[in-house]
């Protein structure tokens, strides 16, 4: 089984993905985990990603897709749930090509919808609990706006 779980920051994607992974014996994949794994392995693609991250830049789609290709190839015969990936239409197109190259298909896409005010309140509380001073309400609202601009259009894709 190949699942995607999508939704805005604070919607509970990671929480729900963990529950589904356990219930259906799936490998839970998040972009952050994949990045860390590739960097820890000092793989070529991991080192590329680390260069961008160390400079404070976003990791480009082509690097993320290269990582995803490597990871999904390793797990091609396993059930997986992708948490929060893809985030953009180019990533979705690339992911579709990866699955085609593996002769696999996405079985289902789960989109979690939560009221924006609830999301902001959750993330503000989470920031307070984690002690992250950089997660201000302004930053949180900006992340929601970026999601609406770049990721929400995937729902129609």
Name each model-derived stretch.
Residues 1-157:
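Glycine-rich phosphate-binding loop of ATP-dependent small-molecule kinases
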